[in-house]
Amino acid sequence: MTTKRKVAIVGSGNVGTDLMIKILRNAEHLEMAVMVGIDPASDGLARAGRMGVATTHEGVAGLVKMPEFADVDFVFDATSAGAHVKNDALLRATKPGIRVIDLTPAAIGPYCVPVVNLEQHVNAENLNMVTCGGQATIPMVAAVSRVAKVHYAEIVASIASKSAGPGTRANIDEFTETTSKAIEAIGGAAKGKAIIIMNPAEPPLMMRDTVYVLSEAADQDHVEASIEEMVAAVNAYVPGYRLKQKVQFEVIPDTAPLNIPGHGEFSGLKTSVFIEVEGAAHYLPAYAGNLDIMTSAALATAERMAQSMSQA
């Protein structure tokens, strides 16, 4: 019989609550122990209580005092970048070897996008899940990168305003910075750029991501096959992840190069990928694919780490 590792979630907002429901319903190697918030009236804490999960509204300071904390092996932090630095320090002061999965853009640990680099980090003590936009788009950059050298990649993540809680809104600058860096570090681009758009349309629109990749000249069939293979790999843990339309290519000749401000002229192959992410509607409705891809990636990561601990 599989030993389930107990987990706590810090942050009882949209992301934390969605993740809790996924763990309770779908986890094979993890067991929900504590939901941590700072607002005693939050819907996430109320829902956790109704689902039989222990709660505290006193933040991480409250968590480390709880008897349940003694058995917790994993903590998911779904707060904000600024709060995560303090949370991680307090958790380690109490339990030095604890595994922390960071769902904020703080990035004090290595970046992780499961389909690209999870196996390199199964023993990490703090792992950063980049951002929702990063989880959706970096696999596409990496897919091109394994076929041809990528000089520049730019992503535009469009999410429904209703899916963005106060934590997401407070972290816009951190979102763009962390995603841009991870496009380079994990995606393999020499230079990365990220843009996020919160769309106030009613009814809310599903998460859409556009990925532009400028690479050396390459066989377009090979690039497309690599992208389709990567989409299938992401879809294994995010069932609503899909190509919205066929991959588009444009050959940029040496005689008419593109000028990228700040980066100079470019010729080669431009690949455009259009992604749609439909949420599983565990907490917010299906338009909130940005929640789903983040929590699904975090769950897949922790499940693999827990499995590795059991095999050790």
UniProtKB/Swiss-Prot annotation:
UniProt lineage: Bacteria, Pseudomonadati, Pseudomonadota, Gammaproteobacteria, Pseudomonadales
SMART domains reported in the protein's UniProt record: Semialdhyde_dh
Superkingdom, taxonomy of origin: Bacteria
Catalysed reaction equations from the record: acetaldehyde + NAD(+) + CoA = acetyl-CoA + NADH + H(+)
Record-annotated active site: C132 (acyl-thioester intermediate)
MF annotations from Gene Ontology: acetaldehyde dehydrogenase (acetylating) activity; NAD binding
Protein name: Acetaldehyde dehydrogenase
GO BP of this protein: catabolic process
Keyword vocabulary terms for this entry: Aromatic hydrocarbons catabolism, NAD, Oxidoreductase, Plasmid
Protein species of origin: Pseudomonas putida (Arthrobacter siderocapsulatus)
Record-linked InterPro entries: Acetaldehyde_dehydrogenase, Acetylaldehyde_DH_C, NAD(P)-bd_dom_sf, Semialdehyde_DH_NAD-bd
HAMAP family: Ac_ald_DH_ac
Assigned EC number: 1.2.1.10
Gene that this polypeptide is encoded by: cbzQ
Family: Belongs to the acetaldehyde dehydrogenase family.
Broad enzyme group: oxidoreductase
Residues at which NAD(+) binds: S12, G13, N14, V15, S163, A164, G165, P166, G167, T168, R169, A170, N171, N290
